[in-house]
Amino acid sequence: MASFPSPPLAAAAAAAPPRLAPGLPLAAAAVRRPSSLARRSSIALAAPANPLRCIHRRAVSPRLRRRTEAVGAASAAIGSLGEEREGCLSCFPRGRRRGRPGLARFAPCALPHTYGLSSLHSGLTGAKIRRRHVLHAAGPDEPHVASPTWSETALDKHYVDQPIGKEELEGFLNTPLPSHPKLVRGQLKNGLRYLILPNKVPANRFEAHMEVHVGSIDEEEDEQGIAHMIEHVAFLGSKKREKLLGTGARSNAYTDFHHTVFHIHSPTKTKEYGEDLLPSVLDALNEIAFHPKFSSSRVEKERRAILSELQMMNTIEYRVDCQLLQHLHSENKLSERFPIGLEEQIHKWDPDKIRRFHERWYYPANATLYLVGEINDIPRAIREIEAVFEHTLPEGEAAPMSTASPFGAMASLFAPKLPGGLAASLTGERSPAADKIKPVKRERQAIRPPVEHKWSLPGVAQDAKPPAIFQHELIQSFSINMFCKIPVNQVQTYKDLRSVLMKRIFLSALHFRINTRYKSSNPPFTSVELDHSDSGREGCTVTTLTVTAEPQNWRSAIKVAVHEVRRLKEFGVTMGEMTRYMDALIKDSEQLAMMIDSVPSVDNLDFIMESDALRHTVMDQLQGHESLLAVAETVTLEEVNTVGAEVLEFISDYGKPDAPLPAAIVACVPKKVHMDGVGETDFEIHPEEITDSIKAGLEEPIYPEPELEVPKELITQSELEDLKLQRKPSFASLSKEENVVKIFDDETGIAQRRLSNGISINYKITQNEARVGVMRLIVGGGRATEDSESKGSVIVGVRTLSEGGCVGNFSREQVELFCVNNLINCSLESNEEFIFMEFRFALRDNGMRAAFQLLHMVLEHNVWLEDAFDRATQLYLSYYRSIPKSLERSTAHKLMLAMLNHDERFVEPSPHSLQKLTLQSVKDAVMNQFVGDNMEVSIVGDFTEEEVESCVLDYLGTVSAPKSSKTQEHIEKISFLPFPSDLHFQQVYIKDTDERACAYIAGPAPNRWGFATEGNDLFNVIRSSSGDAQVSESANTDLTERKHNDVRSHSLFFGITLSLLAEIINSRLFTTVRDSMGLTYDVSFELNLFDKLDLGWYVIAVTSTPSKVHKAVDACKGVLRGLHSNKIVERELDRAKRTLLMKHEAETKTNAYWLGLLAHLQSSSVPRKEISCIKELTMLYESATIEDLYLAYEHLKVDESSLFACIGIAGAESGEETTDDELDMGLHGMGPIGGRGLSTMTRPTT
């Protein structure tokens, strides 16, 4: 199930550079991480955040084609297409891609297994980790990558017993940091470097990445985009890579400023014969990187794909990110060498032009090979590397270096007519005579990327740039970014690490400082973020202050942000703040060290790659923790404030003669804004007004920060004892027929309990993550319980509770700091069927009891505030008004509106509905669902039976929950729009300066458990259709056939078959619509399978151009309906099974996946979910036949009378424009524009 984070009012994060050991620290582990988004170090600070972060889960959600996004978080799609749909990740960010509305909440999977754990709120950070400024072209099947950031909680304050002398301290601090003890580095004679790291997770698999140190920054004026083109052609043209697909391997590629990376995630051995796959994987990488075939047919195919990609990714987010980068790096080529390239140049290149660029840059000495995984015999691995690569362009046969002519591509026109060899050297081209020239030793560039920066340093004389303004009709919110650019501080000694720690402590405080300003009913800003980041891609460290706000509040928002920055800079952090954050940081570091053997190989690999790019010392988790402990003992409050103040000087001292000048100030603003009572009016803003607002904020009077009392516990022991005496918690019988108070399944290790107040308990003890646990409360009901007079009440109510963040007598700040101290991440969410509350916690220092205390307080002593209700209402009003400015959301909105017969429960509430809501009505809508037998709590982690059952009895058993629920009786009928209707096919037009197009095709499907609309039980249909065959069966029916009939009667039959079917349809869509017909760059099929509601639907999402989009829609329909004429074959089914089973096997090593499997195990509203669904999942996949898939296919409504389609077209002459008045209801709004480079990476080709 997809997690769709609430818009950015709750967005906040603090992640610090550089993370010196791979893995995901606890406080960030549950934060959704875009795959491959930013392999860099970051200290990010965002505000305002909530202790209870709210996430609404919508029916219309983004595509889920991605791998696991967080350590301990299950893949959002067991069944997205795996090894077959390979391609390039081009110019969209993986993180931002989640914001593209699709119409499927679930990707194909038999059992839902994520309800948002991957989006949990970090108690310290306040929200998700922001990764920025990453122009990154990437490859086909999105990789699972390491977070380049530290969590916002990590280090502990330890004081030395005896004082250390100054000289002794200096000697220690200048000592080099230790290097990773298991990391093996080497270099072949031809210059190819390699790194090998044995790693146990995932078992029996390894990562092989070939990094070529060439990217868009190395392109000449007439080559813009050619590195990305080579990535496409070389990767997708490799026959050896294709042969690996049948082994269960997945592959990918990406390009960005400074490098191109090809990578393969492979089993260690073939399943059938146990053959070692490392030689084949290395051979494929060798072919891809150094021996590609630049055939005309492949070049033309990829040219079409990239041109389609370029138009598709040209969203307003992309254009904003380009503006930010262009102003930040205006003095060098980073401002104009975006990986996707220029359309007019992409049209022109012939194979020879592309081949010459490849010859210039793709050679072994300019590449690094990374091997991480279950590589037990390192000497043998080195021999395999030597055998494959040693003879690839060895030094003695190296081609002469191509010398770039000062005239670039025009050199041949100006060069004199000289003999071939000399003329070629002048033009940079090879001639036959060149082969006789003594070869030149080719080495990689010493500085990557090879650019010069203008640094924002004190006393550096340069002219101040006036604020730049980017204004566009598709921008909804106001945002401003203030940038400071300095050289990267390479972390190689304890002194360097100490500086990082002090910056983290200092910047962590700013989040809470600004948070206190967020308590008013109408805050002037939407979010304020401070990001301090090392970027290997850009070769610099950038500090960014980002402020987003409603356009009418922009002046006040700027003033508040810069005022808080100046206050922190002038007064510094308090002793209490320093101690608090030091404690949290050291705890988090210790937790990470305990998880040293559970970090996925790809996380380790990407961490090493980024660290090497930044020239940071690479340590393992244990070394990182010990080093942090050592430097923590030496940190003083005075030094923390001195180091931190230097980071903020470009803001706090803005306008002073000796202050460091901002590298750029960029405001991104709308052209028109909505004014109550007036409507749309022009939005005017000038650079001098921005400057005046900054200066005005800095002149406001400042006061020091008072110390805040942080609770050590939310429920005292005496209070707990009183509760136990009053409510006498106990475990009750699980069955009315038998007196069974506990069920334990030996095969799965799952235990089931039920409390006397009706709350159901499921738990599983694992060692997947050392001394870490996860917990989820599921409450039945969700938005489906909203009636015609309370539309939006549940979603606004959940958001209101999150916005308040208070419990009992504890303020929101106290609750958040309680989470910080106990390493608790939590989130509050809702969807159409359920309300969720989720936790991730450490088990050290009673962390599990602290998490249970917080859950108890939310259930028993929740606080509903009028100002929080006002903020939540305003938030959804803003989202609604932003719909017409998004092509994808407008198109999806119109389709959903038609398909579900104007049912507002599946979309965002309209302004009319919001006006009807009151604080009491939303409170009632939410809390009426919190009744005992309607609540289920699941816990998974490295705890003991005694620990978990004690917490359950003490904190859940003492909840005074009512014992009966009538929620289901209040669910109004849900139906699809009947045929015929003009709304079965619609079009949306958006006015834009650039042309784009997209389309959604959708239709009814069953739910996960075999129920269709009107409550029809499809198992009865199957039984009745096979009744005649059963009557005529002989008594000697084959045992295998009998067993298969049992599979068809299994409660998960439709979940299994539909997920397999989705895999196959996805594959066919890609092969037909994208690859063969060239009508799209991106097409996907997804299923929305409900658990409780008796319906579901499928969605095909396709992007195209205005001239091709109608053909693309027809082609998609043809694929969808063509499964009868073009029958499924065993090869397709086997590949789909292998993909889903491999993902299932890998995910069972994570706590969050098990948390999802436990969901609804005792839910009365999901009666067909039982323990056999978990135990027999693998068997069900393996047993599925083609006939089974066609049984499921018959219940996907694909005929013309059942199918709905909506085409969206954007352009200057796109027709009648969609307006606010045409929207009866809305979908999730786009987050405020902000953050550098978030959408400029390349999209996946699959």
Curated annotation (Swiss-Prot):
Enzyme Commission code(s) on record:
3.4.24.-
Instruction: Identify the species of origin.
Output: Oryza sativa subsp. indica (Rice)
Cofactor(s) needed, names only, are:
Zn(2+)
Protein name (database record): Stromal processing peptidase, chloroplastic
UniProt enzyme class: hydrolase
Homology family: Belongs to the peptidase M16 family.
- Which GO CC annotations does the UniProt entry carry? chloroplast; chloroplast stroma
The record's remark on the cofactor is: Binds 1 zinc ion per subunit.
Q: Where in the cell is it found?
A: Plastid, Chloroplast stroma
What broad class describes the main subcellular location of this protein? plastid
Functionally, this protein is described as follows: Cleaves presequences (transit peptides) from chloroplastic protein precursors. Initially recognizes a precursor by binding to the C-terminus of its transit peptide and then removes the transit peptide in a single endoproteolytic step. In a next step, pursues the cleavage of transit peptide to a subfragment form.
* Tissues in which the UniProt entry reports expression: Widely expressed.
Keywords assigned by UniProt, alphabetized? Chloroplast, Hydrolase, Metal-binding, Metalloprotease, Plastid, Protease, Transit peptide, Zinc
Disulfide-bond pairs as recorded: none
Would I find Protein biosynthesis among this entry's keywords?
Answer: no
What is one GO biological process annotated to this record? Answer: protein processing
| InterPro entries noted in UniProt | Metalloenz_LuxS/M16, Pept_M16_N, Peptidase_M16, Peptidase_M16_C
- Residue numbers binding Zn(2+): H228, H232, E309
